[in-house]
A protein has these predicted regions:
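Active-site-proximal polar cores
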Residues: 204
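Right-hand nucleic-acid polymerase module
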Residues: 1-78, 85-87, 91-111, 115-137, ...
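Short beta-strand
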Residues: 229-233
């Protein structure tokens, strides 16, 4: 179902009929809470979704069908470490609340692959790095344009695979994706078919992990088959082996690229790295040669970032892959404290001053 047809269907419902249906739905859910597959609550119609979110049908239609004249996102750019800029699309409060509702009521209830360590509870860059400590060789690969590679159709298929109806999967897919186009230097958001996960939505990281379950399963299997360990943190893929497997590295990379391409992603060849134990081995910025450690370069960059934030504010600043800057710097400061207590204490003090000065969150959130 296209966004245009969905909009027409949603508009066709009169307000008085909407009230009647919502009252009926309330009674129905009290008598028989429906279940989709995976133990998830079932939402078969736009009316049921709107009721569950606690918003009107008209509001749901507004959030699901955006055009260049109705912007649901606030775009801003951040600098990449390798040069250039990355567009972050931060959803406005109402859309962000809808995305967070989907995250908390659906996405977080599902299991991801054990190899995935990014954007999930009880896993971090630390748990992602630990399996690779003391490895004989480490191979790092990077997925190019990770979120942009996950299209609306893939997101919709994810929800269909969870047992949701076509109309429901369409609505969830539209709420969780967007299409960015530049007109005269301005970023506009359209209802085109070329939609993808926005980098900035609270639902995007969880969706990416769920979409990547098959990718992770295939890569973990091929890695194990030739004596490698595999983990993934967002778009960073790491393979390591404790034995001398130098003769198998080219075969690993070749087969890995084939799987990645067949799963709809692309390897960024410029970021492929191979490091044996005579070199400094890093996994998502963590040194793992003999124990977990942090490079002086990374510590210096983090100290500079905290200073800039404290002096200039949150706008335009970033740390790591998270779009929640406060959460990112808090997490990294805590991580440093685990390895270097004195430096960590210094960083944590800086973070607390930043929180007192600018607040604990970057944007106000509306929760349904």
């Amino acid at each position: 179902m296209s966004s245009k047809n969905l909009s027409t269907n949603l508009l066709a419902t009169e307000s008085n009929l909407e009230k009647l249906q919502i009252d009926s739905l309330a009674l129905l859910r009290w008598l028989r809470p429906p279940q989709a597959s995976h133990g998830l609550a079932e939402y078969n119609t736009p009316e049921e979704i709107a009721f569950a979110m606690g918003i009107s049908l008209e509001k749901l239609r507004f959030l699901a069908t955006s055009t260049s004249l109705i912007k649901h996102y606030l775009p801003f750019k951040i600098s990449k470490k390798t040069g250039g800029e990355r567009i972050i699309s931060a959803p406005k409060p109402e859309l962000k609340a809808a995305q967070r509702w989907i995250l908390e009521n659906i996405l977080e209830k599902l299991e991801i692959h054990n190899a995935a360590h990014g954007f999930c509870k009880n896993r971090s860059i630390v748990t992602n790095a630990k399996p690779h400590i003391g490895a004989n060789v480490i191979v790092n690969l990077d997925l190019k344009n990770f979120f942009q590679s996950i299209s609306y159709n893939r997101v919709k298929e994810l929800f269909c695979g969870l047992g949701y109806s076509e109309p429901t999967a369409t609505i969830f897919g539209l709420i969780c994706t967007t299409a960015e186009i530049a007109i005269n230097g301005q970023i506009n958001y359209t209802a085109s078919e070329n939609r993808h996960l926005p980098q900035g939505s609270p639902a995007s990281p969880a969706i990416s992990n769920l979409v990547c379950r098959n990718l992770d399963s295939r890569l973990a299997a091929i890695a194990e088959n030739i004596g490698f360990c595999y983990t993934r943190y967002a778009d960073d893929l790491t393979f390591s082996a404790s034995e001398d497997v130098s003769s198998k590295i080219s075969n690993l990379i070749k087969n890995t690229k084939f799987i990645i391409t067949s799963e709809g992603f692309t390897v960024n060849d410029n970021k492929t790295k191979i490091a044996d134990k005579s070199m400094q081995q890093e996994v998502t910025g963590v040194i793992v040669n003999t124990k977990l450690n942090i490079s002086k370069k990374t510590l210096k960059a983090f100290r500079a970032t905290l200073y800039q934030i404290e002096q200039e504010g949150l706008s335009g600043k970033t740390w790591g892959k998270s779009t929640n800057l406060i959460a990112a710097i808090t997490g990294f400061a805590n991580y440093v404290a685990m390895i270097h207590p004195n430096k960590g204490a210094e960083f944590k003090s800086s973070v607390e001053r930043i929180k007192q000065k600018y607040g604990n969150s970057q944007t106000d959130e509306v929760r349904f």
